[in-house]
Amino acid sequence: MGEEQVQEFKLKEDCELRFAAGEDSEVVLELVHGYAEIFGTEIILNKKYNFPAKSRVAVFTWKSATIELVGATESAYVAESTPMVIYLNIHAAMEESRKKREEQAVSNSSKPKGPRLLLVGPQDVGKTTVSRILCNYSVRHGRTPILVDLDVGQNSVSVPGSVAALLVQKTADVVDGFERNMPIVYNFGHSSPSQNLSLYETLFKALASTINSQIEQNDEARLGGMIINTCGWVDGEGYKCIVKAASAFEVDVVIVLDHERLYSDLSKELPEFVRLTHVPKSGGVEQRTAQIRSATRGENVHRYFYGTRANNLFPFTFDVPFDTVTLCKIGAEQLPDSCLPFGMEVENHETKIIIIEPSVEIKHHLFSFSRGSIAEKNVLTSSVWGFCLITEVDMEKRTISILCPQNTIPSKTLVYSEVTHLDDQIER
C-alpha cells in the first residue's frame, strides 16, 4: 500500500477551503494553526475529523488557518469569495431582533417571541447548509432555536417523507450534523409535495400548530425563534406552498437564495411586516443528480436505524402478527363524479384514511407509528412516535417482520410511506 495523500492549505482571512472526499476513501481533516469553522461549528485545534467517502465540506476562517487533509480527494481548493459575511449579518439581525423583543416584553409584561425565518429557493442552492449555519450561530450566542424542515425529499431532521422540527440546544457535530433528540415528526409518506398537496399543507399546518403549543411554556425556545428549511419546488403549486407555509409559521423574515423572480413574486405577495432578502448561493454548492438524491435518502434512512460511525444505534428485528396492528395509508384514488350517488359531494380523497391489508407489496417500505388511532379518527393530524421498516411479510404465518429502534412497537396504528429502503446492514 502506498502512503496516503497529504495536502496542506493556508487560508487567509474570510477564505474557505472546499473539498470533496473521494468515491471510496475517507478524508481526515486537522486544523493545525489558527481558527476555522465548518458550517457554523468551530473546529478544535489539532483534533482529527474523519469525513466519510463522498463528503462535501467547506472550512471557513474569519481570521486565518492552516488545514491539513489526509486521504484522497475528488477536489480541494481555496475560495476567496464566499457569502459567509452575508450569513453572519442575517444572524446578527436575528439576534438584534431577539434583544428588542426581550426589552419590549419586559416593559409590557408579555412573552417575547423570537424571529421566524423561512429559507426558500430552488434545488441545490444550499438552503439546508444555510439553516445549519444560522442554527449554529444562534446556539453559540446562547439561544435555542427551532430547526424546522419541510423538505420531504431531503429532510435533515428525520427520515425522507417527513416534515419535522427539532429544538437545537447544541451546535451540530462537524461530521454528523445535529443530534436528532426528540423531534416533532409528521409522516407525509412521499418524497415530493406534488404527490399529495392537500396532505402536505395539512401536515405543515399541524406541525406549526404543535410547535406553537409546545413553546408556549418554554421561554428559551420561544425566544430562540425558528429557522425553517423548505423544498426546492418554487413554481406553480410549489410557490403557493411557500406562501402558505410563511403564513402557517407566522414568519417575519424570508431569505430567498439565488432566485430573483421568486424574490420579486414574494415581495408582492407577502405582508409588509415580512422582511424579504435575496442572497446569492455559495460557489461551493453543486448540482445533485437524481441518483445522488436517491442515495442520500437511503443514507438518511440507514442513519435513522443504525446511527453514525461516532454514534452507533442497534435496532431490533422482530415479528408482529397481522391481527395485532392496523396498517393504513393516507390518500386514495379519486372517484369520478359519475360513480357517486346523486347529491353526494366528493370528499377530499388526498386526506382520506384507508385501511390496507398486509401483503408482499409493503415489503421494504417505511411505516410510521402514529400517535393517533383509527378509532379516534385523528391519524391524519397526529405526529408520530417513530418509524419502522418492513423487512419481510409471511402470508402463511400471518406476520410481518420489522426493523425498529425499540424492542416493542409504541403504537398499533402503522401508517404507510412510499419511501422504500433495502436493509443491507452495511456499516458506514
Swiss-Prot record:
This is Protein clpf-1. One of its GO terms (biological process) is mRNA 3'-end processing. Belongs to the Clp1 family. Clp1 subfamily. GO terms for cellular component: mRNA cleavage factor complex; nucleus. InterPro entries: Clp1, Clp1/Grc3, Clp1_C, Clp1_C_sf, Clp1_N, Clp1_N_sf, CLP1_P, P-loop_NTPase. Its main location: nucleus. ATP binds at E16, R56, D124, V125, G126, K127, T128, T129. Gene3D superfamilies: Clp1, DNA binding domain, P-loop containing nucleotide triphosphate hydrolases, Pre-mRNA cleavage complex subunit Clp1, C-terminal domain. It is found in: Nucleus. The lineage of its organism: Eukaryota, Metazoa, Ecdysozoa, Nematoda, Chromadorea. It comes from Caenorhabditis briggsae. Keywords: ATP-binding, mRNA processing, Nucleotide-binding, Nucleus. One of its GO terms (molecular function) is ATP binding. It holds the Pfam family CLP1_N. Required for endonucleolytic cleavage during polyadenylation-dependent pre-mRNA 3'-end formation. It comes from the Eukaryota. Residues 99-118 are annotated as: Disordered. SUPFAM superfamilies: P-loop containing nucleoside triphosphate hydrolases. The gene is clpf-1.
